[in-house]
Amino acid sequence: MKKINISFSDPSYILPHPELNDGLCLRLRNAVSLPRHVQAHSDAVTELACCLCNMLESNGYIFDQKLVRSGALLHDIARLQRHHAKTGGELFLQLGYPEISQIISQHHGLLEATLDEAAIVFLADKLIQETQRVTIEKRFADSMSKCKSPEARKAHEQQLEQARKLQDIIQSLCHITLSSGGQTYTTGAEKSLNLVRRYFII
C-alpha cells in the first residue's frame, strides 16, 4: 500500500470546513462572548445589507447574498479586541474562509472602490448606528469623537468618502434615494421585496 503524506503547512492542502449558515454564525458569536448589543447591531447590519442585495438584484446586479449575510453577521466578531476588523479578518483567514475574511477586514475601510460583497456590508454598517437606521453624515459625526490622532481622523475621513461614493453608486444603479427612515431593525426572517421597499424612497 502506498503511503500518503499530508502536510498541513502545504498551501495546497485545505482543511474541510462547514458552511457558514446563520446557526453557525450565531454559535461563533456566542463562543467569543460577543455582547448582546453588538450582536443586535450585527443583525441590523445584516438585514440592511440583504435589503441592498435584493434591491440591486431587482435591477439586474447580482451578488452572493449568502456571502453578504454571513459576512455581515460576523463583521464585528472580534469587537472586543483592538483593531477588531483586522483581527477578525485574520481569524477567518486562518479558519479557511478567505472571502469572509475580506468582508470582515474591510468593514472599517475598503481596499478598492469596487461595488462588491465587502462594499455592501461596509455601507450597511455605516448606515446603522447600534440598531437604528441613520444617515451616513450622522453616523460619522457621532463617531468623530473617537478619533484621537491625526491618523485616526484621516482614516475616518477616508471611510466617510468611501461610504458617500458607494451610496451614490447604489442610488444611481437602483434609481432610489436611501432614506434614514428612523427604522429600528430587529432579527427575523428575510423580508420580501415589497417589504424591502419600505426602507427606500423610490
Where does each model-flagged region fall?
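A generic membrane alpha-helix/interface feature
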Residues: 93-94, 143
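A short small-residue
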Residues: 23-32
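Divalent metal-dependent phosphate-bond-processing catalytic cores, especially two-metal-ion Mg2+/Mn2+ enzymes
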Residues: 2-17, 31-61, 74, 110-202
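His-Asp-centered metal-binding catalytic motifs of divalent-metal-dependent phosphohydrolases/nucleases
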Residues: 45-49, 63-93, 103-111
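Amphipathic alpha-helical interface surfaces
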Residues: 84-88, 100, 116-119, 136
